């Protein structure tokens, strides 16, 4: 049986659980949407049934794998023999672990063999890995006949163990290893987290556990485990003669830190336990990790011990957020205490370039999007020169979130996306916005003409691919493909509007109404309109050759004359003029391809259709990103001006699918007519399943 890495992980998790688990929990575990989980569950159900297992669904409780223990064990055994398909990130981490562990260069083919991929895949992974390690001051030597070797200072290697490996550790896995060790059931030679031996790691854990009473403060579970891994790796490196260096003035500063005495206590115990000599610089290194660790109790931060600058910055941040969300939090001392307990070690982490991992980051960004954006702006303003990661900001959001009355519903942003036709570039832009800002709750699409009839006050933001000629409409204009600069502009736009958005949501105190049974006649008519447009598109889809000459204006006329022969438009000249006007508003070429998407909604169009044409003469056209490209294939998507909302959704699903991935763009660019028809068929099938129509 073939299973993707995600399906294997999902199935294994279900088999090992003895409790009901919700789809939301699974989505957070897998770091995907709940929709993806539902799709994966459909794939693994048949495999479970082969050994007599079923998925029991209980409303309000979740899912549970039900069946005999023998059936579960059989499937787990099969999974262990299944060829493992590593994700790209997993491969990069495994390569990094191999390079950290090896004192000698590692051959490319050895890595490819171990990861069960091609040499070319490993080469690409190494290119990406170089980007990962560069900020740490590490480089890769890659020479034919020599192999691959990780080069850089010992301090940097220690740091990368924390930032790229420890931050991805599984606390549950660590605790299970400790439990097995207590029961004498662990293999001490096995590697944990790819870089440290399990035996040494568990020995280190016992030592630190015994030292807990002597250490002046309590670490959170994640910080405690991270310290265990850091110190185990440090001891292994010291045994190999690899020690870190530290400037004398930095060391002297650390000696004055309140954590230094605890670091000395730990170092002395490690010298006795492992038979090594720990230099002063290594004691300084331990001090840094203690300073950067999150504490279990906020009361461990005494007012007289807190850096004055950090205290002032924290108070200013609270005042800024209070003003932003129109709620006074400046007198909430519990919030101040909790923030200080997080921010003091956070500032140390940032100064030392030590990252922290927040497994709830994506959910926090979704649930408290506006608060997250406000805090992101606040730390940038009041902690200048310090780069707070998304993980750090998400932790700060939790502190504010617990002190606020901001409900998750208040933080949800609803956007209206506008383009000239409402069926082409608006859906492309919405797709890109979902990728860049998945926290935006929902998107509606509109053409410029439809915008006049929209209640724009029902939306928190309006994003357009074309200038909006109407007065009193606040909007931001970006490219349909939303480059990095555009994405940043949208984020800044949201930050400016946070007070207005929250005020509007709070002022409209409409009570939630019970969901009524829908009008089934209306629902059936709506489904009929969806089906009608799908039929029109599939029945009239073709990939044809179009003989053209170098005159671009003639190209449009020839195109529309062909469409008139097919019975799809009325007046070719009028339609050509309308499309030429549309082209003046912004390029239609799809960047990175040789295609352009010609989309138009106009009364000259008889019915909705999607056609493609290969050109005998390439043309230079403006792309959606403002650059020119050589067009050899035209994608034509058109509809009558009276197209229903359901029809617009169907055509938008196509334009979204075109740019969904590199594979999708390549397919639309290179495939033949029959393959493209099947691709459209799959697009509609997937869309209907997601709409729960099938």
Swiss-Prot record:
SUPFAM superfamilies, per the entry: Phoshotransferase/anion transport protein, PTS system IIB component-like, PTS-regulatory domain, PRD, Winged helix' DNA-binding domain
Modified sites of kind Phosphocysteine: 419
Swiss-Prot/TrEMBL keywords: Activator, DNA-binding, Kinase, Phosphoprotein, Repeat, Transcription, Transcription regulation, Transferase
The PTS EIIA type-2 domain, residue ranges: 536-683
Cleaved signal peptide residues: none
Mutant lacking the gene: phenotype: Cells lacking this gene cannot grow on either mannitol or glucitol as sole carbon source.
PTS EIIB type-2 domain ranges (all copies): 413-502
Enzyme class, first EC level, given as a word: transferase
EC number: 2.7.1.197
Induction of expression: Up-regulated by mannitol or glucitol.
Any Gene Ontology biological process: regulation of DNA-templated transcription
GO molecular function, one term: kinase activity
Superkingdom, natural source: Bacteria
Domain PRD: 195-300, 305-410
Sites bearing Phosphohistidine, chain numbering: 230, 289, 342, 399, 599
Gene3D superfamilies named in the record: 3.40.50.2300, Mannitol-specific EII, Chain A, PRD domain, Winged helix-like DNA-binding domain superfamily/Winged helix DNA-binding domain
InterPro entries associated with the record: BglG_antiterminators, HTH_11, Mga_HTH, PRD, PRD_sf, PTrfase/Anion_transptr, PTS_EIIA_type-2_dom, PTS_EIIB-like_sf
Family: Belongs to the transcriptional antiterminator BglG family.
Function: Positively regulates the expression of the mtlAFD operon involved in the uptake and catabolism of mannitol.
Protein name as it appears in the record: Transcriptional regulator MtlR
Species of provenance: Bacillus subtilis (strain 168)
Upper taxonomic lineage: Bacteria, Bacillati, Bacillota, Bacilli, Bacillales
Gene name as annotated: mtlR
